[in-house]
Amino acid sequence: MTSAVHLTFSYLKRTLLFRFEAGTSRGVLHTRDVFWIKVHRMGDVDQVGWGEAAPLNGLSPDFLPDFEEVLGRLLVQANHRSWDMEEESLLQQVKALVPFSLPSIRFGLETALLDFLNGGRKRILANTFFDQGAPIPINGLIWMGTKEFMLQQINQKLGEGFTCLKMKIGAIDFAQELELLRYIREQEAAKNLVLRVDANGAFSIQEAMGKLELLKDFGMHSIEQPIAVGQWKAMRELAVKSPIPIALDEELIGKIDKEEVLNSIQPQYLILKPSLLGGILETREWIQLAEKLGIGWWMTSALESAIGLNAISQLTSTYLPSLPQGLGTGKLYDNNLESPLVVQFGEIQYNQEGIWETPS
């Protein structure tokens, strides 16, 4: 039986600055607010756990005008309770304290507590990524933008040795997007490239199948969210008839009854974003159900800083993934934290000799 302890919780806010105009289906991003959760024993800051709560505008259920006040109130409650210091127990305690409707706070609190439990070294879970420096294969992301900007990114990612590219589509003329995909396939470096596209729900139900037929010629691995969320019957029909495997992404956010979603649509893949789904415990439940139903999956970060990306990478590593994951590179922001996370040759790795910058 582990002993319960009282801990001190607080947070720091930083506005991260994008290095470029980050085009998404919900507009162009220039900045991103993150809240780093800090936990330690009262009067002892030698051992500190850090987590990240950073809701995304237009995607996170907890992107709220009073988010900072909500976070502050929950941390006051966390200060006034005792914590049973065991991994599974901590996850259950966070679930009991933080409502399902606040997924980024759940994720941040889970991460901070597990980091503290493991000595405040940024080790969240037992995993080969942190413990042995084992790399995780990732996809190179091609952001939405002008055709010229997307072409520039394609050449850069191929030059960096990525073996899997994911291109966001639905922002520019579809014919131009097809030209870009054709260009990728014509490159010598892309002969065996795994190619994914993410439509972010951009296709109408009426046009979706026609566009999928045009995309199939490029040897697609999968397409994420071809139509908008909430159209389960139409999405199920696409999952049955599409020449390209369907992956659900936004469709999973805010869903308590996981089995209902998956049985209704029966997709080929799931895209799992822990900070949007409710953290480690919720993500593990999605994976357990997906594997029971024979549905593939991969993990994806959601523009987190190095604190969040580190936690998601470690969670991913516990499953020893073979598919390329959608983990970020940590190079999105001018003022991200310095960290041991490095990306080279299409893999993310934890440099065990690297140094962490302390959040401030």
Label the predicted regions.
Residues 12-14, 141, 249, 300, ...:
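Conserved beta-strand termini and adjacent loop/short-helix elements that scaffold enzyme active sites
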Residues 320-331:
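Short helix/strand-capping turn motifs
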Residues 2-195, 200-202, 209, 214-217, ...:
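N-terminal capping/lid subdomain adjacent to the active-site entrance of alpha/beta enzymes
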Residues 113, 314-315, 322-323:
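Short, Φ-rich (hydrophobic/aromatic) sequence segments
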